[in-house]
A protein has these predicted regions:
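His/Asp/Glu-rich metal-coordinating catalytic cores
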Residues: 66-140, 145-257
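Intrinsically disordered, low-complexity RNA-associated tracts
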Residues: 1-72
Length: 257
């Protein structure tokens, strides 16, 4: 009986060791993505310094932590004004404002409800844009679906602002602008995933994502107040139609910034 008990105990220990090793491997993989390893090591180093330096070490370590991890920012607010796309499908248009600079993110249309007879499309109410027309630095686009770019021909007839988007997104937009006879009046700027564009107080960073349409991007707005991440429509796809997977690593880096 004793031998049997010893055997069972040994087997249990071996099984536990295997489980622990597997768990550590999983945790390590997650940590590499999220940056937990780096944070844990920093915390361990701070704890060691605290133990050796006493109270003064605590003050220095905590002060250093605040300095390293808190982004520099101002007390001036960022104003975020959605003109469409909330609690509805379509009409995605969001305005970001900081002091005298404004940026438009996406400019989509919506299809009419069944009871809206005689209406072909619905676009956002752009009355507010007329109030800030001289402060709009540009329009940035996430992808080429109608609910994100469909209103642009109507908006660009009233505002002369540069437009930024990926090659496919602008290719689709060009056809629309040509139909409306304003293609030569609009300044279109082709960007690639990874590019950064300075627009007044904003720096728009374009990050590759996956969606049901190729060449989609998320947009990280770097501002004096902090970073605003607008993912756009996206999915995590291991076999994306444009061969490149969503840039999760960059999302993780932005989370640490």
């Amino acid at each position: 009986m004793k031998n049997n008990n010893d055997t069972r105990q040994n087997n249990n220990k071996q099984a536990q060791n295997v489980a622990n090793k597997m768990a550590h491997k999983v945790v390590d993989k997650i940590a590499k993505i999220s940056g937990v390893n780096e944070k844990t090591n920093n915390n361990n180093n701070r704890n060691k310094n605290n133990n050796s330096n006493g109270k003064n070490g605590n003050r220095n370590s905590n002060g250093g932590n605040r300095k390293n991890n808190t982004p520099k920012h101002t007390d001036k607010p960022i104003r975020i004004i959605p003109l469409g796309g909330l609690n509805e499908i379509g009409k995605n248009l969001t305005v970001f404002e900081y002091e005298d600079d404004a940026l438009i993110l996406d400019c989509g249309m919506a299809f009419p409800d069944d009871d809206m007879l005689g209406v072909d499309i619905v676009i956002p109410d752009i009355t507010y844009l007329h109030k800030i027309a001289d402060r709009i630095r540009g329009i940035v686009l996430t992808h080429g679906h109608e609910d994100h770019i469909g209103a642009l021909p109507y908006v660009l007839k009233e505002f002369s602002v540069p437009v930024y988007g990926t090659r496919l997104t602008l290719g689709i937009l060009k056809n629309k602008l040509k139909e409306h006879g304003i293609l030569n009046q609009v300044k279109l700027n082709t960007i690639n995933a990874g590019d950064k564009v300075k627009l007044g107080a904003f720096t728009a960073e374009f990050i590759h994502t996956n969606h049901s349409i190729a060449d989609a991007v998320a947009i990280a707005l770097h501002t004096p107040t902090g970073i605003i991440l607008h993912t756009g429509d996206f999915k995590i796809d291991s076999t994306p139609i444009d061969s490149d997977m969503i840039d999760l690593a960059r999302f993780g880096e932005l989370g640490k910034e």
